[in-house]
């Protein structure tokens, strides 16, 4: 079966061009302005006039809660939410129960992801057994079982010796190591960033050095080992400065920023609405501005959502006791397009690189991130011209925990295609 996506503004090879895309048998057959030579009488047509046609977005940081907490999210609901947001490839973090920390457990997750996922789900292995021990996993074994990278996300690796051995092992087999950077000895019970706002609200604050101290340590270890070291959800200007310096000096480091750290600061916290509670916590306005600048200067390589659904019960508690995290898959592109591209802070081409091309290339997801003849037809179509209101009733995720509910944005997903199959389509009014 053939599908012709016609008259769209197509992002391809770094350029936005008015052209058509022909999909046949799950792959991209042709891209161009006149594709009639490829057509017969049996094809479907999608008129993408006034719409953006993009490579399917890539999010290397999601939490699908299955197995262990399926009341919060499942592979099916999480991947449906990803498709709703225009994502066709995601990276599933290993903070599930049981933790995928052996080749057998990783293989089980890979098979389950393939069975239940509406999008391509790349699976992380843990770095250490149970994500909290000092025993480094069998890196060669988990890679052979299908892990695309390793991470203990949700916890930082506390012992420098453990991290050094993990980096050596990951480097030996060519696995990226993605780090949740948090020195737990510096938390001091903080539930938000320490500063004027935490003192005003009377909430316990944790200093920003919680993050930057571990970034500094890990960059030294990454330089010593040569591993591909990836910093998850970077959030402070000091961390950015060190990452920028490390890149200039040959360290193989990449990093991601989240939409919420790019768009919100600790000034948004009122002490009651726990939708503003996440980890890393919202930072100072100077950090937020530094993150936005780092999107343009290349310090930040990609945007990842850290999609973290929770039940209303877990998020409805007192701010100090509520769970960390917000949902992100379904709103990320629209929020960033509205708040960064439409305001002139970021070019659309750069946003698409940050959300599709760059993460795919950094993590060697070779079939993702590009529209290319002969490659899988993983495609997202967005409406950049008509505003809509973010409404939790529209979410396909089980989690509705978002501080962005009620915001008017542009960039609604019209259609998402995975391997040539439509996995999400906007309902027309």
From Swiss-Prot:
UniProt xrefs under SUPFAM superfamilies: Composite domain of metallo-dependent hydrolases (SSF51338), Metallo-dependent hydrolases (SSF51556)
Lineage: Bacteria, Bacillati, Bacillota, Bacilli, Lactobacillales
Catalyzed reactions: (S)-dihydroorotate + H2O = N-carbamoyl-L-aspartate + H(+)
Job description of the protein: Catalyzes the reversible cyclization of carbamoyl aspartate to dihydroorotate.
List of residues binding Zn(2+) 2: 153, 180, 233
Family: Belongs to the metallo-dependent hydrolases superfamily. DHOase family. Class I DHOase subfamily.
Pfam family, one: Amidohydro_1
HAMAP family attached to this UniProt entry: PyrC_classI_B
Pathway membership, UniProt: Pyrimidine metabolism; UMP biosynthesis via de novo pathway; (S)-dihydroorotate from bicarbonate: step 3/3
Gene3D superfamilies: Metal-dependent hydrolases
GO cellular component, one term: cytoplasm
UniProt binding sites for Zn(2+) 1: 61, 63, 153, 306
Co-factor: note: Binds 2 Zn(2+) ions per subunit.
Source organism of the structure: Limosilactobacillus fermentum (strain NBRC 3956 / LMG 18251)
Ligand binding (substrate): 63-65, 95, 279, 310
One GO biological process term: purine nucleobase catabolic process
Residues the record marks as active site: 306
Name of this chain's protein: Dihydroorotase
